[in-house]
């Protein structure tokens, strides 16, 4: 089933398909997706700190399945959506804003979907997600143009270290934080566990929130990540009840 959906998405992005054939494939595969006001997005992962590729499917055959399962569940909870793998750690997302005329509501829904996906990728796979968004909504017959656009935009990811959302290469691109950057979280936890508290510079994290002007939801995610690290370190360093009884 997943293989057939991946193939359908590849065809939609690279060749013209008659509407009758498209509808037939969607009916057979049980795909619920409006065919207008579609947002096209590529999902990739930041390479690991040691230089290894972020693509883990070669090590875990269930990686693709897990990623797509989570992404599609989030898309369906927020409305119509479809996701597939293009191979080499590149995933394509389609979600429809059909019937919605408010740009503010379209942007809010898009941001909510990406934030949830980013959060799940970090929590379940320890992967830093990046997103390349099409510059406009399209109907299903014009996805090829959008795919060329986001594929070109993906080259810009080379210049970004943290989770980011890229929309336009013509304008200055900004990194949109999706929670605490993974490397910051790891160094924070390591310093706490080693007892080198002087290396924990909370001011740098708060300065990052201020200078990037992250919204309330993102700030909440960052603070929740900090609390999570502190909680894990407390559990790691606190003596067990048995040890306390001995003392």
Residue ranges and their predicted role:
Residues 10-39:
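Juxtacatalytic helix/coil linker segments
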């Amino acid at each position: 089933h997943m293989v057939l959906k991946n193939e359908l998405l590849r065809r939609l992005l690279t060749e013209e398909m008659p509407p009758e054939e498209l509808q037939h494939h969607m009916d057979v595969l049980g795909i619920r997706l409006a065919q207008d006001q579609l947002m096209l997005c590529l999902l990739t992962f930041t390479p690991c700190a040691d230089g290894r590729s972020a693509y883990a499917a070669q090590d875990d055959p269930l990686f693709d399945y897990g990623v797509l399962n989570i992404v599609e569940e989030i898309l369906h909870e927020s409305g119509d959506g479809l996701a597939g793998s293009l191979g080499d750690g590149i995933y394509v997302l389609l979600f429809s804003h059909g019937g919605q005329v408010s740009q503010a509501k379209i942007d809010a829904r898009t941001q909510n979907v990406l934030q949830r996906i980013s959060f799940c990728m970090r929590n379940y796979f320890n992967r830093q997600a990046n997103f390349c968004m099409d510059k406009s909504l399209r109907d299903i017959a014009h996805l090829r143009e959008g795919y060329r656009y986001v594929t070109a935009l993906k080259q810009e990811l080379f210049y970004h270290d943290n989770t980011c959302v890229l929309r336009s290469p013509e304008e200055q691109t900004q990194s949109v934080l999706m929670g605490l950057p993974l490397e910051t979280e790891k160094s924070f936890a390591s310093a706490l566990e080693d007892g080198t508290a002087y290396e924990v510079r909370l001011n740098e994290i708060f300065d990052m929130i201020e200078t990037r002007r992250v919204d309330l939801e993102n700030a909440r995610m960052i603070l929740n990540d900090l609390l999570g690290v502190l909680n894990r370190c407390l559990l790691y360093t606190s003596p067990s009840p048995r040890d306390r009884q001995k003392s």
